Amino acid sequence: MSAVLERDAGALPRQVEVAIVGAGFGGLCLAIKLLEAGIRDFVILEKDQEVGGTWRDNQYPGAECDVQSHLYSYSFEGKPDWSQRYAGWEEIHQYILDTTEKYGLRPYIRFGQQVDGAQFDVKSARWSVHLRSGETLQARHFVMATGPLHVPNLPDIQGLARFKGKVFHSARWDHSYDLT
């Protein structure tokens, strides 16, 4: 079965031309540009269950971009109607979702696929990409598009064990927790 047929069936392809790690701004942009170049033999490996990267993860109250909103869009997919100069996470994430749909990227994404490692084999000129599930796929090109913020870092604060409240990272906001 070809990689395209396997991808359409939702299975993880065993071999692709390009393996992209991460379905945030970077990984999705690369996928769009590959499609525009006529390259369809690729897969996006996303550890979570939705696209969006930082803007999927950081859903804390008041989260918004720290640069003007129009800079948080692809140059080829402008958004002139941002609701405010510094858009909130919901609007930015919706832009990512809308762009994903517009360019038909979902069939290329494999959600829940954590990459544990990759090795390049000089003889075959291919990457072996190892997934947490135990599966391995082969790729001619391997692109890390995870971004610097995909793993929350809780600092080691002296006395934290004595704190009586709940401790959680802003990238793993607990919306059920009452802060009042």
Regions found by a protein language model. Name each.
Residues 13-16, 138-140, 165:
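Active-site acidic short loop of glycosyltransferases
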Residues 2-5, 73-82, 88, 92, ...:
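Glycine-rich dinucleotide-binding loop and its adjacent helix/turn
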Residues 84-150:
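Feature captures the FAD/FMN-dependent oxidoreductase FAD-binding
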Residues 16-44:
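N-terminal Rossmann-like FAD-binding beta1-loop-alpha1 element of flavoenzymes
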Residues 35-60:
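Glycine-rich FAD pyrophosphate-binding loop
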Residues 12-15, 178-180:
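Short helix-loop-beta connector
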Residues 1-14:
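Basic/polar N-terminal segments that are highly enriched at the extreme N-terminus
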Residues 47, 56-95:
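Glycine-rich active-site loop/strand segments that organize a redox cofactor
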